Design a protein with these regions (language model features):
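Conserved ABC transporter NBD signature motif
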Residues: 62-73, 336-344
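ABC ATPase NBD coupling module
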Residues: 74-91, 109, 117, 123, ...
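Conserved ABC ATPase "signature" region
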Residues: 125-144, 344, 394-412, 522
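Conserved ABC ATPase signature
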Residues: 148-153, 157, 417-421, 425
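A short, surface-exposed alpha-helical micro-motif characterized by mixed small hydrophobic
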Residues: 216-218, 484-486
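ABC ATPase "signature
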Residues: 231-235, 243, 499-503, 511
C-alpha cells in the first residue's frame, strides 16, 4: 500500500524578478514498510523535495503538483491539516543535530515539548515516555541524561536524541536528511543499524536522503537519483548498482576515490618525524586549581614522513589526530622530539621558527570557515606571500593566476569572494593558498569530508598530482578510510590519544592487527558496526 505519493512536484523560489527552479517534475512513491533513498550531489534538490512533503519551505517557495499521504492531499492543505501530519505521522531527522537541538534546554525539556503537544501526556508519564525513548535509541543510563544539555553529548548521542524526538509520536514515515554525514564511520554504522532496527520493530517507512552510495546500498529498498532538480533514474537498489542506465548514475557509482599513491624513491629525504610525542592537558580542580590528572590527547606518538610520501592518520573524533598534526607544526605545545627538515623545532624560538613556517602549510576541513568572507580569492591566496616574501620583487597577480590554474580554477575568478563558489571550488582555493608558498609539508585535516563523492575524487586526484609534481610530504587526517587508501602510503590508527596500529596502507588494510582497526574497516567498507 502506498504511504507517500509524490506526483509531478515542482518547486520554484521567487526573489524580486528572479525565479529559481529547484525541483522540476519529480514523481516517486514510498510504500508501507519500505525505505526509499533520494541520492544526488549538493544542490540536486533532494532536501527541498523532502521538505516539500509537509511544506516546511520558506514563503518564497511556490509548490505545484501533488503530494498525498495515506491518500490525503498535502499541497495546498490548511495549516491545521499540516500540523496534524507533521511530527505525528511524518517526522524528520536532520544532518546536524547541534543546530536542530536548542542549546539552552535540557534533553528532557526538548523531548517533553513534543510529547506534551502531540500526545497530551503530563507529569511522570512524560518522563517515563522519555526514558523509554532514550533506551530504545541506545543511550546508556538514560535517566541520568535527562538533565544534560546538547553540548554535553557526543555527536552520536545528539543524533540518537534527534531520532528519539522523531520517534516520540510513533510516525509512519521517517524522513532522514543526511543523518550520518557528520559522524565517524563507526558511529555512522551504529546509527544505520539503529534506524533499521527501529524501522523493522515499528513497521515504519523511511525516506533517506544522502550523497553516500555506501549507505544507500546498505539501507535502501529503492533508489531515486536526482540531478539539477529532476529524478534521472529510479529502481530497486540492486538493479541501480548492478546496471545503472543514466550516465549521471554511472558517474556517481564510479566516483569513489580510487587508485593508489605513487611509489616514493628510496632516497627520499625525511621531512618530518616525531619521537615519543606527548600532548597532555592538565585537569585542574579545587580552590587552588591543583593538577588532579591529565587528559592524554596524544600519548607517545612516533612517526616519520618523507618527501613525496603521504602519512594517513585515522581515528574517530577525539582520538588525537588533529592535535598531533598541530603539534608537528608547533601550533600547540608538546613534549618529546619533533624534527622538521632536520631541525629540532622544540629548540627554536619564534624568530627562528618563522623561516620554516612557509615550508609547512595546512588545509582545513571546512573551507567556508577557513576563508575570510571579506577577502577576494586573490587576497586570500597572496596572504602568505605578503607575510613570507614581503619586499621581494615578484608579480603576485601572475603567481596567483598560475596557482589557480594549477588547482583547476579559472584565474579570471580571482576578484570574486568565497560565497560565490561551490564547496569543491572553495577547497581548491584553500589548496592554492597553501601551495603558492611551495611548502615541503602539508597537513590535510579532513579536506574532503564535507564534499560530495564526485568532488572528493577530483580533490584526491588534484592532491596526488601536486604531490608527484613537487615532492610534497602530506599528513592526511581523515575518518574516511576509502580516501585514505587512495591517497596514502603509510597510515596510523589512533584511539583516545594512543597509536594503536601503524604500517603501510597495504599491511593495515589487508592484515589489521587490532580489534579496533578491524572495527573501523568493517564500518567503512561493509557499513556494519561491531559490538
Amino acid at each position: 500500500m502506498t504511504l507517500l505519493n509524490v506526483s509531478n512536484l515542482t518547486v520554484d523560489f521567487r526573489q524580486d524578478s528572479v525565479t529559481t527552479h529547484a525541483v522540476r517534475g519529480v514523481s516517486f512513491k514510498v510504500e508501507k514498510g519500505e525505505t526509499v533513498a533520494l541520492v544526488g550531489e549538493s544542490g540536486s534538490g533532494k532536501s527541498i523535495t523532502a521538505l516539500s512533503t509537509v511544506n516546511l519551505l520558506p514563503d518564497s517557495a511556490q509548490l505545484a503538483g501533488s503530494i498525498t499521504y495515506n491518500g490525503q492531499e498535502l499541497v495546498g492543505a490548511s495549516d491545521k491539516v499540516l500540523r496534524g501530519v507533521r511530527g505525528n505521522d511524518i517526522s524528520f531527522i536532520f544532518q546536524e543535530p547541534m543546530t536542530s537541538l536548542n542549546p539552552l534546554h535540557t534533553i528532557e525539556k526538548q523531548l517533553a515539548e513534543s510529547i506534551e503537544l502531540h500526545q497530551g501526556l503530563r507529569g511522570p508519564a512524560v518522563r517515563e515516555r522519555i526514558v523509554d525513548l532514550l533506551d530504545r535509541v541506545g543511550i546508556r543510563d538514560a535517566e541520568s541524561r535527562l538533565t544534560s544539555y546538547p553540548h554535553e553529548l557526543s555527536g552520536g548521542q545528539r543524533q540518537r536524541v534527534m531520532i528519539a524526538m522523531a520517534l516520540a509520536n510513533g510516525p509512519e514515515l521517517l524522513i532522514a536528511d543526511e543523518p550520518t554525514t557528520a559522524l565517524d564511520v563507526t558511529i555512522q554504522a551504529q546509527i544505520l543499524d539503529l534506524l533499521e532496527d527501529l524501522k523493522r520493530d515499528s513497521a515504519m517507512s523511511m525516506l533517506f536522503i544522502t550523497h553516500d552510495l555506501t549507505i544507500v546500498r546498505k539501507i535502501a529498498d529503492r533508489v531515486c537519483v536526482m540531478k539539477d532538480g529532476e529524478i534521472v533514474e529510479t529502481g530497486p537498489t540492486d538493479q541501480i548498482f548492478a546496471n545503472p542506465q543514466h550516465p549521471y548514475t554511472q558517474m556517481l557509482i564510479a566516483a569513489e576515490a580510487s587508485g593508489q599513491a605513487a611509489p616514493v624513491p628510496d632516497d627520499a629525504p625525511v621531512m618530518a618525524e616525531t619521537e615519543n610525542l606527548r600532548i597532555w592537558f592538565p585537569i585542574k580542580r579545587g580552590l587552588l586549581r591543583r593538577t588532579a590528572g591529565y587528559v592524554k590527547a596524544v600519548n607517545d606518538a612516533t612517526l616519520t614522513v618523507r618527501a613525496g610520501e603521504t602519512l594517513g592518520i585515522v581515528g574517530e573524533s577525539g582520538s588525537g589526530k588533529t592535535t598531533l598534526a598541530m603539534a608537528i607544526m608547533r601550533l600547540i605545545n608538546s613534549t618529546g622530539r619533533i624534527a622538521f627538515v632536520g631541525n629540532d623545532i622544540h629548540e627554536l624560538n619564534q624568530k627562528q621558527m618563522r623561516p620554516l613556517r612557509s615550508d609547512m602549510q595546512i588545509v582545513f576541513q571546512d573551507p567556508f570557515g577557513s576563508l575570510s568572507p571579506r577577502m577576494t580569492v586573490e587576497q586570500i591566496v597572496t596572504e602568505g606571500l605578503d607575510i613570507h616574501r614581503a619586499g621581494e620583487k615578484i608579480d603576485k597577480k601572475q603567481l596567483v593566476a598560475d596557482i589557480l590554474t594549477e588547482v583547476g580554477l579559472d584565474p579570471a575568478l580571482m576578484s570574486r569572494y568565497p560565497h560565490e563558489f561551490s564547496g569543491g571550488q572553495r577547497q581548491r582555493i584553500a589548496i592554492a593558498r597553501a601551495m603558492i608558498l611551495r611548502p615541503k609539508l602539508v597537513v590535510l585535516d579532513e579536506p574532503t569530508s564535507a564534499l560530495d563523492m564526485t568532488v572528493q575524487a577530483q580533490i584526491v586526484d588534484l592532491l596526488r598530482d601536486l604531490q608527484q609534481k613537487y615532492g610534497l610530504a602530506y599528513i592526511f587526517i581523515s575518518h574516511d578510510l576509502k580516501v585514505v587508501r587512495a591517497l596514502s602510503h603509510k597510515m596510523m590508527v589512533m584511539r583516545a590519544g594512543d597509536v594503536v596500529e601503524a604500517g603501510s596502507v597495504a599491511d593495515v588494510f589487508d592484515n589489521p592487527q587490532t580489534d579496533y582497526t578491524r572495527e573501523l574497516l568493517a564500518a567503512a567498507f561493509e557499513g556494519r558496526s561491531i559490538a
